[in-house]
Swiss-Prot record:
The keyword Iron applies. It comes from Myxococcus xanthus (strain DK1622). This is Dual-specificity RNA methyltransferase RlmN 2. Residues 119-355 form the Radical SAM core domain. Keywords: 4Fe-4S, Cytoplasm, Disulfide bond, Iron, Iron-sulfur, Metal-binding, Methyltransferase, rRNA processing, S-adenosyl-L-methionine, Transferase, tRNA processing. It is an enzyme of class 2 (transferase). [4Fe-4S] cluster binds at C133, C137, C140. It holds the Pfam family RlmN_N.
Length: 378
């Protein structure tokens, strides 16, 4: 039998190299999930998990090299199997009232925004949960973007870590966590990204993490009724409802979600919401001139909210180009508030922060994207 030469063998394409194992986004893991990863995937003892977790979420480490009390071998294992997904600061815009809007670039080239609002007694961060938003509220600039994607738990939490670092650097704070309050009222509908929000909240409230109290975290929703029930059962932070109208006709014109879950369904969910002793649901009501700011609106609002422990935040509309709405004047806003107060509804006119940098309520839309380190608002 003749030998077969190498040149006579059939020509075949080389087999592709095996795809590299996907790295684990380690900062998106709850402490329980991190413990499983450390013991089952890395073969390490369980006590290493809270050690790594504290580096990530108390100290805000952005690389495994910073974790100096871990062995070199463990750090090598982490580099081989896991990653810390970065948020890169694209720019910061400073308002005359002290508010700072931060724009972050994600690894896939998307942009999100967070707004830092310092006052004498608190330092609050407004956090985003999505790139864009699917809710399409007619008075909100974020709604004009559409939904690009959900943020991961690590991208939600990274906003908090990054602003903590900025505040420590800029204001000279020695504490690892100068921020006192978090409001999930930035880009996106938080309950539309509920699983990632829930994981982020567990990280932010962990004693091995930033350790925010449930009293100092508020999540706002346009009214995804089925998710409000889950939110009440599976988290313990405060709830805010973006209402903005006193009739279904009004609300459906500006908030498409109302066509699926109307005001009656929304308020029924609020009446069933489990509230801690002494806690109230916040209702946000954007005052739009000639649309929802009449005396009749205030009286209807009083009737709608009966039986619900509430406070109402009245928010003078922040005008956005091209949306066709105008803000209610200060005098009219005060008259509206007084009617609510006479009806035994606790109501407050919220001072808008960051309007001059498009950082106020309803203005976040990545306008004026710039390169890192610049301060342009154009």
């Amino acid at each position: 039998m003749s030998e077969t030469s190498a040149t006579s063998l059939p020509v075949t394409e080389p087999l592709p190299a095996p795809a590299p194992a996907k790295l684990v986004d380690v900062a998106s893991l709850s402490l329980e999930a991190l413990s499983r990863f450390v013991t089952e995937e890395l073969g390490e003892r369980a006590f290493r998990a809270p050690q790594i977790y504290r580096w990530l979420h108390q100290r805000g480490a952005t690389s495994f090299d910073e974790m100096t009390d871990l062995s070199k071998v463990l750090r090598e294992k982490l580099r081989a199997r896991a990653e810390i997904v970065p948020l890169v600061k694209d720019c910061e815009l400073r308002s005359t009232d002290g508010t700072i809007k931060y724009r972050w670039k994600t690894r896939d080239g998307r942009y999100i925004e967070s707004v830092y609002m310092p006052t004498e007694d608190r330092r609050t961060l407004c956090v985003s949960t999505q790139v864009g938003c699917a809710m399409a509220c007619g008075f909100c600039m974020t709604g004009t973007m559409g939904l690009k994607r959900n943020l991961t738990p690590s991208e939600i939490v990274a906003q908090v870590h990054a602003v903590n670092r900025e505040v420590r650097k800029n204001e000279g704070h020695e504490t690892l966590r100068p921020l006192s309050n978090l409001v999930f009222m930035g880009m996106g509908e938080p309950l539309h990204n509920f699983e990632n929000l829930k994981t982020a909240l567990s990280i932010l409230q962990s004693e091995d993490g930033p350790n925010f109290s449930h009293r100092h975290i508020t999540v706002s929703t346009v009214g995804l009724v089925p998710m409000i029930e889950r939110f009440g059962k599976e988290t313990d932070v405060k709830l805010a409802i973006s209402l903005n109208a006193s009739t279904d006709e009004q609300r459906s014109k500006t908030m498409p979600v109302n066509r699926k879950w109307n005001i009656a369904a929304l308020l029924d969910a609020c009446r069933k919401f489990p509230l801690r002793q002494g806690r109230r649901i916040t209702f946000e009501y954007v005052l739009i001139k000639g649309f929802n700011d009449a005396d009749e609106d205030a009286h209807r609002l009083i009737e709608l909210l009966k039986g619900i422990p509430v406070k109402v935040n009245l928010i003078p509309y922040n005008e956005n180009p091209g949306l066709g709405f105008h803000t209610t004047g200060e005098e009219r806003a005060e008259e509206f508030r007084a009617i609510l107060a006479d009806g035994h509804v606790a109501a407050y006119i919220r001072r808008n922060r960051g309007r001059d940098i498009a950082g106020a309520c309803g203005q976040l839309a990545n306008r004026g994207e710039t390169q890192a380190g610049t301060d342009s608002t154009t």
